[in-house]
């Protein structure tokens, strides 16, 4: 698209009371600015131009692997002054101006704005707000059609303060017009700043129609200035996501107690209990249940699978008809196939487990390949690390490992083997045999138990 996108992101964010720049505060797991940039990329612009100031080096370092054209605003003298700093970077036909503290701006709204601006020359996003205090007002002509100017709150007269249509600050302007009008800005106002909104009056003087595109939801255009506003907007966002899932047939026990910090996709008859957190891309197939206080990151959950309470699942694939937890930890690069039982206080890392196998209690399984119909007893540990390198354990089909067993990798437990309780296995165990490594038991006669002195 013949479009440059300017993102205003220079402010300190004093009201956040934080050491971070405002645009680097996290909204649902990502910095504000990253979310705005993600939306900007969906529009396929020629350039994305963030205008930064406070802790500019910190921001540039964070985004160093992304194709962005940063511009520095050394003094914060208003929105108009900020865009002036980008004049030499703007080379496309249209310029879209966004704000780095509006994390939920969506590309569908922006496409409407861009399309309208192509036809008229300038467009801006507005919103009808019940309580418009603190926002610039959209002033229209006597027929309530044509936008003639925007008046900032501190410059409003008594009648203008009654207007409920507000300016969101988001606008799209044909670049030739923008450069001409920026050159005409002055700071003759209560704040002694260069207001970008003053270009609306210049547009009218040049008989360029100003079109207003109304946002459908307040969350999509809401800026964040304080930690309280951040928390409230996050909660509104979570509730919207929960309502969408409920409307798709997902049973969420309490929509006020769910955190969706990424993308959650659910099929039919999924139930999600209270206190669950979902991060990254998570999918849950039909008839599965997620118990209370599960944390699930970037994972796929199969059909008819039950996640009991208090599990932590990260970057894992869990198949159909599985039963997990409570208190299980499934770490990255783990694949559980179908009909698998993982019980309480079991940790699994970088392992694959085949159908109908179970690890019911208190075990660590790392860098391990487990076959079908394997039963691993309580207290089993795969010792995969020698202090320098990781090694693999292979447990073939139909193996039974009794309790309190250590498997010293690299090692193979072959098909049908049984490992006796309390063993430390350092060599491969043969097929269909009982393998033991216990110290011989001793019984001492005439033993006198020590007494306290």
Predicted feature locations:
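N-terminal nucleotide-binding beta1-loop-alpha1 segment
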Residues: 1-18
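Conserved N-terminal catalytic core of the sugar/cofactor nucleotidyltransferase
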Residues: 4, 30-112
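Structural beta-sheet core signal
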Residues: 5-7, 50, 96-97, 122-125, ...
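Short glycine-enriched, charge-decorated loop/helix-capping segments at active-site entrances
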Residues: 20-26, 72, 185-188
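Conserved core of the sugar-phosphate nucleotidyltransferase
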Residues: 105-190, 197, 207-208
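Conserved alpha/beta core of the MobA/IspD/sugar-nucleotide pyrophosphorylase nucleotidyltransferase superfamily
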Residues: 164-267
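Acidic, glycine-rich loop-and-beta core segments that form the ion-binding/anion-interacting portion
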Residues: 264-334
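Glycine-rich hexapeptide-repeat left-handed beta-helix
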Residues: 308-453
């Amino acid at each position: 698209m013949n479009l440059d996108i300017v993102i205003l992101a220079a402010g300190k964010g004093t009201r956040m009371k934080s050491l971070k720049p405002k645009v680097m505060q996290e909204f649902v797991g990502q910095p504000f600015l990253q979310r705005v940039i993600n939306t900007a990329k969906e529009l396929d612009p020629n350039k994305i131009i963030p205008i930064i100031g406070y802790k500019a080096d910190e921001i540039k370092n964070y985004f160093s692997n992304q194709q962005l054209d940063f511009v520095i605003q050394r003094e914060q003298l208003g929105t108009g002054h900020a865009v002036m700093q980008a004049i030499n970077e703007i080379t496309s036909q249209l310029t879209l101006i966004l704000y780095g503290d509006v994390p939920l701006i969506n590309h569908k709204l922006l496409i409407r704005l861009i399309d309208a601006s192509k036809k008229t020359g300038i467009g801006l996003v507005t919103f009808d707000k019940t309580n418009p205090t603190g926002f610039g007002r959209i002033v229209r002509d006597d027929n309530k059609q044509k936008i003639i100017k925007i008046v900032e709150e501190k410059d409003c007269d008594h009648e203008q303060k009654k207007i409920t249509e507000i300016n969101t600050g988001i606008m799209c302007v044909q670049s030739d017009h923008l450069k001409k009008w920026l050159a005409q800005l002055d700071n003759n106002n209560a704040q002694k700043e260069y207001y970008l909104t003053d270009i609306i009056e210049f547009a009218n003087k040049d008989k360029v129609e100003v079109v207003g595109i109304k946002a459908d939801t307040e969350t999509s255009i809401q800026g964040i200035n304080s930690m309280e506003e951040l928390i409230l907007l996050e909660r509104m966002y979570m509730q919207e996501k929960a309502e969408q899932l409920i409307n798709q047939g997902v049973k969420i026990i309490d929509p006020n107690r769910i955190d969706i910090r990424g993308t959650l996709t659910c099929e039919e008859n999924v139930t999600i209990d209270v206190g669950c957190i979902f991060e990254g891309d998570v999918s849950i197939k039909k008839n599965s249940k997620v118990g209370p206080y599960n944390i699930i990151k970037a994972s796929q959950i199969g059909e008819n699978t039950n996640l009991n309470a208090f599990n932590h699942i990260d970057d894992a694939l869990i198949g159909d008809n599985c039963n997990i937890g409570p208190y299980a930890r499934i770490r990255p690069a783990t694949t559980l196939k179908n009909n698998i039982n993982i019980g309480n206080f079991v940790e699994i890392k970088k392992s694959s487990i085949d159908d109908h196998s179970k690890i019911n209690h208190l075990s660590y399984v790392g860098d391990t390949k487990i076959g079908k119909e394997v039963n691993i007893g309580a207290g089993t540990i795969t010792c995969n690390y020698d202090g320098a390198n990781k090694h693999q354990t292979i447990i073939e089909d139909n193996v039974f490992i009794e309790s309190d067993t250590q498997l010293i990798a690299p090692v193979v437990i072959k098909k049908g083997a049984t490992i006796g309780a309390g063993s430390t296995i350092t060599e491969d165990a043969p097929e269909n045999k009982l393998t033991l490594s216990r110290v011989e038991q001793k019984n001492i006669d005439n033993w006198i138990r020590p007494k306290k002195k």
